[in-house]
Amino acid sequence: MGRAREIGEGNSSSLREQRNLREKDRRMRMKHLFSILSSHVSPTRKLPVPHLIDQATSYMIQLKENVNYLKEKKRTLLQGELGNLYEGSFLLPKLSIRSRDSTIEMNLIMDLNMKRVMLHELVSIFEEEGAQVMSANLQNLNDRTTYTIIAQAIISRIGIDPSRIEERVRKIIYGYIYFEA
């Protein structure tokens, strides 16, 4: 009987230790989660846990409202764009850049109602990227402006990086208009 009591006590102490370990792990996990939450919500000062949870909840509600607002704005903009495209009164800029060997050709079509991009700005991009402009044209047809630039690399061994030119041209285009991708 004494032996059974010892075994029973051994089991209860090991169960107690297991519970204590689980509780310690749970506390450590919660402490870690609260520190992550704190870093996202208020990185400037340390808040007590109840205030931190309140602030996190209000922050999440604010983010959700912001997402809903942006979704609605996107939907109305897309509907407006489609309506304007059907009416023919609005055209988003279309940029295409093709390169072959040491020659590069850029075509840009923009709506005439948008603020104009200056041809010399586009030409200077090509020259700064190490290209000699062979031809630069600007045409106004109906409600559209078409820019065409054909350039050749000054040093054919080095060539021209079309992606870099495209990036710089897009910065100029979208600096003049508001466009949400």
UniProtKB/Swiss-Prot annotation:
GO cellular component: cytoplasm; nucleus
Residue ranges of coiled coil: none
Location(s), subcellular: Nucleus
Subcellular location, principal: nucleus
InterPro entries per UniProt: bHLH_dom, HLH_DNA-bd_sf, MASH1/Ascl1a-like
Residues in bHLH domain copies: 14-63
Keywords associated with the record: DNA-binding, Nucleus, Transcription, Transcription regulation
The keyword DNA-binding is assigned to this record: yes
Chain residue ranges for the region called Disordered: 1-22
Single GO MF annotation: protein dimerization activity
GO term, biological process aspect, one: regulation of transcription by RNA polymerase II
Source organism, top-level taxon: Eukaryota
Similarity comment: Belongs to the bHLH protein family.
Protein name as annotated: Transcription factor bHLH167
Organism lineage string: Eukaryota, Viridiplantae, Streptophyta, Embryophyta, Tracheophyta
